[in-house]
Each structure stands twice: as structure tokens, then as C-alpha cells.
């Protein structure tokens, strides 16, 4: 048979035949024989390889034998490029045609070509005998692969074993112990089994938020099927997870995707209810593969789902269910909903305890029970935009991975010594070139130091290696225990009770003894001195990971805050001068809240700061952020003068749907979602439009607000401060006259009531009035500002000293009761900082000098102090 007509062959078969002349030319041969076709088939990595692998043939070996046979054939030298068909290939194609007729196929396919080889006297017969393959064995394997399919088009290979190609057998994975244990979720699994046992519409769809464990329920069902813990209707069934991505990938031509899907569905229905299909992210089925006028995958599924021919479990999130499946009422009615809710913190702890062993074996570390409790409680409290148990499992996983990374990388102490040795070695090399006495003396000292360091390095290296070896030994023992437990389960499933008992009371007991001995060895190794490696995940590790995720300082999560809260007032007094009443009121409110006496559903504290400009309102907010949350970055400052129009409220919580900027979220809500622990400063609130205050009502009362995209943003851990200049003229009127304080407070509060609505004022914890500053307080502020300048000069190793007269001079120059401390800042910049900068640039002061500042002729004078004066 001359292979001249590609229409007689399937695409893959013709591809292999068309490749044979190329192979012959590569080997300088003019005659194309059956061995060239075999090489082409093996290089294809398609159906031929699959059939031979199923027959137990080593593909590498058969490929090598074919190559060796080709190499032994005569070669033709010269420039001739013509090749012609050999007799063996001609007769092989005739036999393939005969097999096609036997199978009642329309085209010659790969399997027909393979079946023709056992009778190929030239090459195939000997090759197949060597690998113990005959025609009947090949036919049986081909029937297994093809099932009931016949070759009716030129691409039949895509439909063979389509479930194997586009699906993952979850029951097989459960049998091999590849799935994580599923703890709890009994109600959801029972309801799923109940729906699967119906006669028609036996298709449950698991819907719930991302990360609550929908896929885990399907895996739990697979584990129950394997354990036989299911009703008769599901006994010995296969649960296969369909990979929609693999089905769509590479479907180049119109209808190819539908063809693949039909092949999968045909295989499922022909199994006679033996296969249950699981489609994760089932919303991808709606609209998949639909081009102009073509049917989508959802419509192909509908008839089978309604008749009960196909048992299918779907899983999707609430948003996607609403967006895709609810729109298609015909598809929705074929699925029965199983709602999967987020587990409670207690249930999450149980889930983590069940998974603990898996993670310990994978990472080779120990995970303490307290760290599991911390992961569940802290993630529930601080990570509000994700769901349990997923976020808690992620925390434990990342903390264990971080610890594993520490174990495998060099300890910090050892790394420091290595770097020090390297530095000294380089110094030694340069000193060896010098011949003076000082250099030789330094060289001797250096060599002694090097010898000591190398000795310490050797000791630490030995300790690190021994600790690492024991930890690795621990991991391998745990892995063996895991394997033996899996073997015990398999033996019990097969009712091989002798084997199960032998493993349980023999191998497993020995392994547990080895585990205890290794743990003792580790504690002895680490007990000899300071341990270099930790092998247990603790609460602190979990807290550190949460801190990295959310930006919440670790001290908030782990350390006791009592000390911090007790010293809060003192700390604020250091930074905010002259506002004792304000500082005390703020500290009291926060201490009340943190001690658990305040309402937990409201912000930690909310204040309105009233007072003239420059008296420390913003400074107190900064000091509070810095002390409570360890960084001034925790201060979220929103200037209310930018919210003077009614529509500006959309900038705080995000633009409504349909408006430009809807996707971006709001300035306030997005910031607090990313950093839930913050001090929020609304500056100059009297300048905002009255409608903007409506948003404050729910923040101050319920501690939460819903943004334009429907996310609930939690304000319960924030401290809210609003500043205003309302009534500042009354405060300035009584500057220094404490006898009129009550009268002034009454007038300021009256001004507040005239400007703001009662429902807003009623929700604020405290209205705090700031006094104007007098000269004595300004002098203290001068000292504070000078301390900051000293810190900046420290970088240049320059010291700064000011006489009392100089401090008084700066306080006098910067005193302005109307503008508070701001003119003082400008005076210090003008009189002190600028003059020092100019003197340094002129070269009057150098690094390491001490500058003494005094007053001469009603101006500041600058002089260099001798070192001995300073040291005395």
C-alpha cells in the first residue's frame, strides 16, 4: 500500500508516516522501512507511547533498540536526496489497513500501525518478542484505551481515555494518602451524599466564600468512599475532578473543546453511574467554549444533569454563583445548593490539629499546640478580608516554612564569625607586606585573634551540623511513621488483618521508640550549651507572620500591653508640652478601652481636640500613633478642607457603581483595610461639608463602615481624633487667666453645639480643649527641638551645647501667643540651624567638634569647646 493519500489516515498516523523520510535521511539511508516508522511513533509522545507503557514496556529501552537497528542498516554516501518506500513498510501498511477493517474504523490510526508490527519479519517481530508483546496482548490494551470509541474522524486520539487526560482521580489519590485529612464538615458531606443518592437532579453544588473548604468537602467524600463509609449507592465509586483548564488548553479549532467534553461525558455515562464528576470553579463551565453561535459547555451538560445520567458535584464562590449560574435559571435548577459556612475558631483549631502532623512531616519541624490556637484566634481577629480555616492554615504553613528556612541556612552567630575571619584574613595579608614594629605587633595580635575565632568557628560548625543532623533524622523518622500509617490503612481496607497487626504492633511501635530516642538526642544536643537551631513553631512565629501580612506591630499581638499602657501618660507628657489636661484625658480613655471596660464594638477611643493653632493638637496625635503602634506611619491623616463639597464623601468610602474610580476604593476605607491598627486624624473638621459627618456616625457608633464595593471595614482597633479651631478666640482671650477657665469652656462648647449636630457630638468619647502656651512651656519646647537637632548632628559626630541664656533667648524670639509653637520652630531654624549650617560650610566646625551656643549683643554666638572642657 503506497501512503500517498493523507485522507486514509488519522492526523497523528499521517504525521508519523510523513516524518519517516526525514529520519531515513538523517541516517544516510534511502529506503524507508518499518524501523523508521517505529522511531517516528516513539518520538511522537502520544498514543503509541501510552499503549506501550500500559503493556509494561520501558520506552527508553525500546527506543534504544530501534536506534541501534537503524544504525546497523547500510548507509548511502553521496548527494542524492531521494528516498523510496521499502517492502517491509509497504506490507506493514497493508496489515494496518486490514486491522482497520476488523475494528470497523473509518481511518488508519496509530493503534492499527502498532498492531501490524508483531508480524513484521524484518524488524517488528524480533523487537516485540524481546519485550514479550504479542498481537492479542496489544489488542486487549487497545480495547482498554479506546473503550467503546471507534475512529470516525481524523483526530480520535483526543477522545481516548479523556477522563484520564482531563481529570484527576480523587479516590485514587485518597487511596495513596495524597489528600489532607478532612476534619469536621460532617453535615455538609452528609447532605452532599444525600443529594448524590437522588434519582434525578442528583447534583450538589457547594457554595461558600473562598477558603472555607469547599474543595476539602469533595476530598473528604473521596476519603469516605475509599474507607467504605458511604451508602450502597456510592460504594466503590470513583470521584474524578475535572480540569477545565486542560480541556480548553490547545483546543485550536471550532468544536474541538465540545468534542473533548462530549468524550468525557460519554465515558462518565457509560460507566453506569460508577463515576461521580467533581468540577471545581463550576462557573467556568458557563460560557466555556462558546463562540459565535456555538453551544457552551453549560448547555451540553444540562440534558444529562436533568436526567440523572451524570452525577456531578460543583464548587464555586457566592459571588460567582450569583454572577454566572443564577443568571442561567435552567442550569441553576439542575443543581442543589449546599451552603458551606466559615467554621468557628474552635472548629478551625480542630482542623489545624488534624493537619498538624502533615505539616510537621513536610517541613521537618515541630508545631506547638499553642501556635495552632494562636493561628486560629489571631487570624480571626486581625485578618478580616479572608476566611477560616484557609487563613489560619496559611499562617501555620508559612511559619513552619520560615523556621525550616532558618534551620537549613547558616545561623547568625556562625555567619558573623565567618565574615569576621574573612575580614581579619584580608587585614593579615596587607600587614604581612609591612616591616615596621607596630605592624608586626599588630600582626601577632591579629594571628592570636584569628586562631581564637577559628576555634570558635569549628566548635559552632560542629554544633550546627550535629543539631541539623538530628533534626533531619527526626524528619525521616516522621516520614516513615506517615508511610507505615498509610500501609496500615490500606491493609485494613483490604481486610489483611495479619499485615495490619504486624505493622501496627511491630514496625509502628519500633518507629515511635526511634522517634522518642531521637527527640531525647536532640534535647541533649541542645542542652549542652546555647542552641543554634529552633525546631518548634511557637506563638511568636505566628505573630511575626501576621505582623508581616497586616502591618500590625508584633508587640500588639504577643507582649503584654500592661506596661505600655501604664507608662502611656508619662510618654505623651515628654512629647506634648503644656497640655496636661488633654494628655491625661487621652491616656485615661485608652486605658479604659484596653482594660476591656469600653464597648468592644466601637473604636478604641474618639476625641475632638479644640484649640488655637500650634498648641500641640497634631503633635499629640503623632505621639499617640508612635507610642501605641510603634511607628508614626500608623497615623492616617485626612485633611477635611478637601471635603468641602457634598459629593466629596465618595472619596472617603469610594465612588458608587457606574462612576469613574469605582474600582479604586476610598481613601479612608482602603487605608484602614490594609492597616487596621491606626490613629486616624481628621484635621480641621469644621471645614468639611455637613453631609460628610453622616459617615462618621456609623464609624463612631458601630466601629465599622461599608465601602462602595460592599466590603465591611472594621474601625474597632482605631483611635479617632478630630481637630478643630472652633472657639479658639475664646481660649486666646483668657490666656494665662485660669480663673475664667469654666467660662471659656462653656463658650467653646456653645460654639461647638452651634457648628455640629447633636447626634455627632453625642457619639464622641471626649471633647478636649487645648490651652494657649506660655513662655515657660515654650522654653521646654525649645529644649525638645534642640534635642532633635542634636540627634541630627550626631551623624557628623558634632556635639551641641546651649547655655540657659541661649534657651531663654530662643523662647523669647519665638513667643507669639496667637500662633503657638509654630513661630518657635521657625525661630530655631532661622537663629540656630541656619547659622550652624553656614559655620560648618565655612569650615569653622569639623566632625568631632563640640559647638557651644551663648548670647552676645542680643544675638546667638557660636564657639568651639576644647575637648577637655567637654569631658570635664
From Swiss-Prot:
Pfam families: AAA, AAA_2, AAA_lid_9, Clp_N, ClpB_D2-small
Segments forming domain Clp R: 6-148
UniProt KW Hydrolase keyword: no
Binding site for ATP 2: 611-618
Coiled coil (UniProt feature): 393-527
GO molecular function: ATP binding; ATP hydrolysis activity
Region called NBD2, residue ranges: 561-772
Gene Ontology CC annotations of this record: cytoplasm
Principal location listed in the UniProt entry: cytoplasm
InterPro entries: AAA+_ATPase, ATPase_AAA_core, Chaperonin_ClpB, Clp_ATPase_C, Clp_N_dom_sf, Clp_R_dom, ClpA/B, ClpA/B_CS1
SUPFAM superfamilies (alphabetical): Double Clp-N motif, P-loop containing nucleoside triphosphate hydrolases
Region ranges (Repeat 2): 85-148
Compartment(s) of residence: Cytoplasm
SMART domains to which the protein is assigned, alphabetical: AAA (SM00382), ClpB_D2-small (SM01086)
Keywords tagged on the record: ATP-binding, Chaperone, Coiled coil, Cytoplasm, Nucleotide-binding, Repeat, Stress response
Region feature C-terminal, mapped onto this chain: 773-872
CDD domains named among the record's database cross-references: AAA, RecA-like_ClpB_Hsp104-like
Lineage top rank: taxon: Bacteria
Gene Ontology process terms (BP): cellular response to heat; protein refolding
Keyword Nucleotide-binding: yes
Annotated spans, Linker: 343-551
Residue ranges, annotated region (Repeat 1): 9-73
Record text on subunit structure and interactions: Homohexamer. The oligomerization is ATP-dependent.
Similarity field: Belongs to the ClpA/ClpB family.
Domain notes for this protein: The Clp repeat (R) domain probably functions as a substrate-discriminating domain, recruiting aggregated proteins to the ClpB hexamer and/or stabilizing bound proteins. The NBD2 domain is responsible for oligomerization, whereas the NBD1 domain stabilizes the hexamer probably in an ATP-dependent manner. The movement of the coiled-coil domain is essential for ClpB ability to rescue proteins from an aggregated state, probably by pulling apart large aggregated proteins, which are bound between the coiled-coils motifs of adjacent ClpB subunits in the functional hexamer.
Name used for this protein in its record: Chaperone protein ClpB 2
Organism: Nostoc sp. (strain PCC 7120 / SAG 25.82 / UTEX 2576)
